[in-house]
Amino acid sequence: MGIFMIKRLKKRDVKVPLTVPEDRKEEYIKNYLELTKRTGNVMLFAGDQKIEHLNDDFFGEGIAKDDASPEHLFNIASKGKICGFATQLGLIARYGMDYKKIPYIVKINSKTHLVKTRDPISRALVHVKDVVDLKENSGLKILGVGYTIYPGSEYEHIMFEEASRVILEAHKHGLIAIIWSYPRGKNVKDEKDPHLIAGAAGVAACLGADFVKVNYPKCDNPAERFKEAVLAAGRTGVLCAGGKSIEPEKFLKQIWEQINISGARGNATGRNIHQKPLDAAIRMCNAIYAITIEGKSLEEALKIYYGDRK
């Protein structure tokens, strides 16, 4: 699988949303170019699961012992090649003083999986103003915010309104806004259906998101079918969720196809990175980054991950 050429963006190439005030346009452009490494693509390290999945993803069979401590996430983010590390504000406040060079995306809302409801709802834990205050008071490299919506839930209207306000407030301060968009609820028959995923991507575009994180479809020929979501999102860049840990070769091949066949603008990976020991987690970051940001081939990415180990 050959190399996909990635264009280097200049300031003038960034389409600044009209919701960004004139005096914040430079800040928005700076954050956008930093987050995308001047490519328009994003390799996001997702570390918000300590609320979402409690300790299930961090302790147990097949999970590295390193992962039992939250600091494992920060060690990976500080040593691996990433565009941004997404996690909750509270965790950043507890560890950020020792990891000031990490580019952060603050996850605004989260919920646990303990409440067994067919129609999920996830509300804001903090306000965008709290994020801005942390950025200004700490000097941390906070580039944007993230928010999860569940289209199809009977509570979607609550999340849509809150997400819309989060995006507007983020843009007012020159921050990037990323939406996690997962169709869920008693009326959703198959959340991995490619047509439904495309709809979820389009919802994020209508809310004004800069990027949207969605699940990769489970179907025949997913790389081709996923093109519908990329088209539906328009100028909102589509990022693929990493999902459960799978074999590195299979995962990196999927990443390559998402970028080079489907036209996705990146990925947001959690378990396939942090469930590994630190050295392997760093190598996985570097391999994903090589495909997403550097335009490397699958073979080159596999060599970065395995080195002489295979």
UniProtKB/Swiss-Prot annotation:
The keyword Transferase applies. InterPro entries: Aldolase_TIM, DeoC/FbaB/LacD_aldolase, DeoC/FbaB_aldolase, FbaB-like. Belongs to the DeoC/FbaB aldolase family. It catalyses: beta-D-fructose 1,6-bisphosphate = D-glyceraldehyde 3-phosphate + dihydroxyacetone phosphate; beta-D-fructose 1,6-bisphosphate + methylglyoxal = 1-deoxy-D-threo-hexo-2,5-diulose 6-phosphate + D-glyceraldehyde 3-phosphate; beta-D-fructose 1-phosphate + methylglyoxal = 1-deoxy-D-threo-hexo-2,5-diulose 6-phosphate + D-glyceraldehyde. It comes from Methanocaldococcus jannaschii (strain ATCC 43067 / DSM 2661 / JAL-1 / JCM 10045 / NBRC 100440). Pfam families: DeoC (PF01791). Pathway: Aromatic compound metabolism. Substrate binds at D48, Q49, H53, D57, W180, R184, K213, V214, N215, A241, G242, G243, G270, R271. GO terms for molecular function: fructose-bisphosphate aldolase activity; transketolase or transaldolase activity. This is Fructose-bisphosphate aldolase/6-deoxy-5-ketofructose 1-phosphate synthase. The lineage of its organism: Archaea, Methanobacteriati, Methanobacteriota, Methanomada group, Methanococci.
